Amino acid sequence: MCRCSADSSPVDVKDILNRLKSLSAAEEFFEALGVPYDPKVLDVSRLHIMKRMGQYLAAEDFSHLPDRVIAARARAILERAYCDFATSAPLSHRVFKVLKDHNPNRPVTPGRTVVPLDSFLKPFEKK
């Protein structure tokens, strides 16, 4: 279960968007926004969480909002993105194009040839 924002740390809201833009590590985002996290979840899903956070942020309009409101929304968005992956496997969300395009339940497209790897290795097998 995800932790709620009541468990979070205080946040320095001054110029929060510019500060977020300068961050690179997922842990830095969690620290800057005061969002608690489980390192095990972040180790497995960090790219997915950050990608999802970016998708959620892109849908927001922060123009003309005070920094405290922007910080609160960014914190809520990061919590939401984290919770998406804290309770289910990253593959189930398919946030990256390569995962969206690959559906293991879909049959092979007609006209595409699948060559098993074994067929390449047979000439190299020791006799």
Curated annotation (Swiss-Prot):
InterPro entries the UniProt entry points to: NifW
Q: What Pfam families does the database record attribute to this sequence?
A: NifW
Q: Recite the UniProt keywords alphabetically.
A: Nitrogen fixation, Plasmid
Name the GO terms of the biological process aspect: nitrogen fixation
Q: Name the domain of life this protein comes from.
A: Bacteria
Q: Which family does it belong to?
A: Belongs to the NifW family.
HAMAP family assigned to the protein according to its UniProt record, in alphabetical order: NifW (MF_00529)
Described by its record, this protein's role is as follows: May protect the nitrogenase Fe-Mo protein from oxidative damage.
Q: What is said about its interaction partners and assembly?
A: Homotrimer; associates with NifD.
Protein name, entry field: Nitrogenase-stabilizing/protective protein NifW
Which organism encodes this protein? Answer: Rhizobium etli (strain ATCC 51251 / DSM 11541 / JCM 21823 / NBRC 15573 / CFN 42)
Its taxonomic path starts at: Bacteria, Pseudomonadati, Pseudomonadota, Alphaproteobacteria, Hyphomicrobiales
